[in-house]
Amino acid sequence: MQQRRPIRRALLSVSDKAGIVEFAQALSHRGVELLSTGGTARLLADAGLAVTEVSDYTGFPEMMDGRVKTLHPKVHGGILGRRDQDDAIMTQHDIKPIDIVVVNLYPFAQTVARENCTLEDAVENIDIGGPTMVRSAAKNHKDVAIVVKSSDYTTIINEIDANEGSLTYETRFDLAIKAFEHTAAYDSMIANYFGALVPPYHGDTDKPSGHFPRTLNLNYIKKQDMRYGENSHQQAAFYIEENIHEASVATSTQLQGKALSYNNIADTDAALECVKEFAEPACVIVKHANPCGVAIGGSILDAYDRAYKTDPTSAFGGIIAFNRELDEETAQAIISRQFVEVIIAPSASDAALKVTAAKQNVRVLTSGSWQQRVPALDFKRVNGGLLVQDRDLGMVDTSQLRVVTERQPSEQELRDALFCWKVAKFVKSNAIVYARDNMTIGIGAGQMSRVYSAKIAGIKAADEGLEVKGSAMASDAFFPFRDGIDAAAAVGISCVIQPGGSIRDDEVIAAANEHGIAMIFTDMRHFRH
């Protein structure tokens, strides 16, 4: 099975023509005969290459507006023919062996992503001949190489040169795996698109759910294996989407430090997604997927100083995210002040990297800049199933807020309320966030009762000597009882922001009025589990 196969004849038919002329030139210069179709053949001919149209080779014209081009025995016989046992029948029918197939498929994903895409547009961008050739070549990888990625062009030419015009079995097998992955992803996209057009019904209503396909097909690419998972007895790997349109931990570049662990990646994602909510220079410090300090400042150093003050104990061994370039002064403050697992920012200055280099184990990542948040799906696995929902991109502005108490919030209270509301979205439920002057001063996370999250936020603030009086409090969901408001009043909270929607809203509002607290309803919940 280690046999090399000489490359004498190539079939090229691509939708994405990036690099194809140069690749075809390299093959031709090495004596490889070129077969091609339609637009690819014209492009190669215009580049001065000797190329045979598939229709001339088969003696059968392209037809039906190009729907039928390569679906012919002389094409697939040349691809599927087994060199050690089908030679006679191939000779009998004048079928020439094809040694390498270079194909990429109609741009279905790009087509259906367009706002004005019609069903007819989608249908016409379903490739038939391409996947058929890809699968044929991948099946017969013992004799044929299949290329579906332009990123492999240079590697293939280099190996042909290194192996006297041949490709090894190991390379052909690896290319076949990529090919099957490619067609699986392509068919999944089509199935997901069409499945979402069928009106499935749910529960006891007759309203079609739409939006989600009947069968969900997911394709992710392995970026790296992990030493272990959440715990040392669990194996793990990190998979990413093939086409990511937003700066994220998945697209980040690691500039220094040890390999990222499973928990590092999860926590870094939590920190980065939180810091993206802020337009001003901001810092988010995360521990165990929960923010333990968040602040806005005049600079990222100022923001870091303020975020760190929220909870220095929890910040130890944490993840730090910024929404501005990491500079030398901020890097020095972090390295001299605390043990940190990961620092992530859109970019990092050379001077900052010289500082962090003194701590070689510290992982420094750059995410690139972000312009907007991209709608996507969130997944949560349960035993035997998968919960799927839209990504929570909801956020309110001042025009959407409802003040429900007798007292109106001051301008400062309103700013603090909106700040801690943004933070609460990223704290595990039940989530309570205390904030003042664009800085968290206490965070209560993940408690089974909301009132205890409120109490913990107060305890955290007291432990660090942070003044709560006159601060704002955010709750990710409504208060089911007045006790959360009473607990907030006891430590000096003057403004509360929450979704509202409890059957006891009147009691909760009355409690706020009793304590002279301004209360704002957002009419939007941010559970996080």
Swiss-Prot record:
The protein's Enzyme Commission number: 2.1.2.3, 3.5.4.10
MGS-like domain location: 1-148
Family statement drawn from the similarity comment of this UniProt entry: Belongs to the PurH family.
Keyword list, A-Z: Hydrolase, Multifunctional enzyme, Purine biosynthesis, Transferase
The protein's name in its UniProt record: Bifunctional purine biosynthesis protein PurH
InterPro entries per record: AICAR_Tfase_dup_dom_sf, Cytidine_deaminase-like, MGS-like_dom, MGS-like_dom_sf, PurH-like
Protein biosynthesis among keywords: no
Organism whose genome encodes this protein: Pectobacterium atrosepticum (strain SCRI 1043 / ATCC BAA-672)
Pfam families for this protein: AICARFT_IMPCHas, MGS
